[in-house]
Amino acid sequence: MRIVKLLLYGLFPCFLWSCEREGTDQQYVEVPEGFALSAGTATNFLTSSKAYDFEASWLSGIYSSRFNDGDGLYDDVRTSSNQDGGLGPVYAGYSCGSCHRNAGRTKPTLWSEGGSGNYGFSSMLVYITRKNGAFFQNYGRVLHDQAIYGVEPEGKLSVKYDYQTFEFPDGETYELCKPTYTITEWYADSIRPEDLFCSVRIPLRHVGMGQMMALDQKEIEALAAKSNYPEYGISGRCNYISERGVTRLGLSANKAQHADLTVELGFSSDMGVTNSRYPEEICEGQIQMDQGSMMGLSYDQLDVSTEDMEDVDLYMHCLGVPARRNVNDPQVQKGEQKFYEAKCHLCHVTTLHTKVRGATLLNGTELPWLGNQTIHPYSDFLLHD
C-alpha cells in the first residue's frame, strides 16, 4: 500500500485551529490509498473530539456560509419563546446537539432516578408502543420526559443495572451491564409493564450522512438481490418507505426506516418545534396543550422555517468524514482479517458508490459534489431477521 505524506496546515488552516486548541490532531498524517479514504473527497484526517464537526473540503462560498448557519441552528439551545425556537410544550431534547454532540453520539451519564443530569434522559430517545407495535392512547412513539415550565412531562424513566460476568473461549472474563428500564409518573393512564414495549436508544452519529443520501439505489437493491447466504444464516432485503404518495428506499435511522435525514421530524418529535412538514404540536389533543397556553404559548405560527431546516440538512450532508486510523498497525490488520473471516463484510459492505447527481436537500438544493464518489462505509443498509 502506497503512503502519501500530507502537510495539513497548508491545506486546512481552519482545522489547525482545533488542533491547537485540543492538541490531539497531527500536523503530518499518513494518508493511505484505498479503504482508509472513508468518504472519497469528503474524507478528512482529524482525530480530535471535534473531528466529526468540520465541513468537507469541497464546500465553499454560499454553501460554506449556509453550513455555518446550519451548524448554529443544530447546536443552539431552543427555548419556548416564538423568537427563540418554539421548544415544547413537551420534548425529548432541547437541540440537535443535545443528542448528537459535535455531530457524534452522546455518552449518557445515566442516573438510577431521573435519567441524565438536570435534563432527564436528554441524550437518549425512549420509544414506547404496545407489544404488537400499536401506539397507546394519549401517547406517541417517543416518550417526552421533559417539558417547559408549568407543563407536565409525559413520564419519567428510571433504570436499574445488573452486572454479569462472562468468559471468552480462551478463559478471559468480561463484564456486561444489563439495564432494566421503568417508566413512572405517567401523565395520563399508567401503562402496565407487561403491556409495554420500551426501546431506549442512543442517537446515531451524523457523520457520513451526505454520502449515505447520495448512494446509488440500484447498488443497494443489487446487494439485496444477492444477499442470501444460507450457509451462514444470512439474508437481507431493502426497506421501502411510502410517504406522501411516493415510495423510496429507506436508508437512515434505526432499521432503515427513513428515506431522508428526518430533519423536520427531529425538530417536531424530539423538540416540539412545528414546521411545514409537521405543523401540529407533538402533544396535540393532550392536556399539555392547555397547560402551555396557560404559560403563554401561542400555536398560531410555525416555529422554524423551511429555509432554516434546509440549512441544517445541508450541514448534515456536508460534514467531513474522518479517515480510518492506524491502518498499518499489525493488530488493526489482524482485526480486519478476522472481520472477513467472520463474514462481517457480507452485510457490512466495505465499498459502495454514490449516484452521478449526488444528493438533493429537503427544499430542492442540489449537492452534485456528493456524486460519483467511491466510499468505504463498512455499513449495512438492509433489513435482516
Describe the residue ranges of each PLM region.
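Extracytoplasmic redox metalloprotein regions
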Residues: 45-47, 52-66, 76-309
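Bacterial Sec-dependent N-terminal signal peptides
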Residues: 15-45
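Secretory-pathway/luminal and periplasmic proteins that interact with or process carbohydrate-rich
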Residues: 80-82, 98-110, 321-323, 342-346, ...
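The canonical Cys-X-X-Cys-His
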Residues: 70, 91-103, 206, 312, ...
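Surface-exposed intrinsically disordered loops and tails
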Residues: 43-44, 184-185, 356-385
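His/Cys-centered metal/cofactor-coordination and adjacent catalytic loops
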Residues: 313-325
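Sec-dependent bacterial lipoprotein signal peptides
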Residues: 1-17
